[in-house]
Amino acid sequence: LKVPDLPLPE
């Protein structure tokens, strides 16, 4: 299953 991309800190 593909998990939604988490907002990574830039």
Curated annotation (Swiss-Prot):
This is Scolopendra 8013.07 Da toxin. It comes from Scolopendra angulata. Its main location: secreted. Keywords: Neurotoxin, Secreted, Toxin. It comes from the Eukaryota. Coiled coil: none annotated. GO terms for cellular component: extracellular region. One of its GO terms (molecular function) is toxin activity.
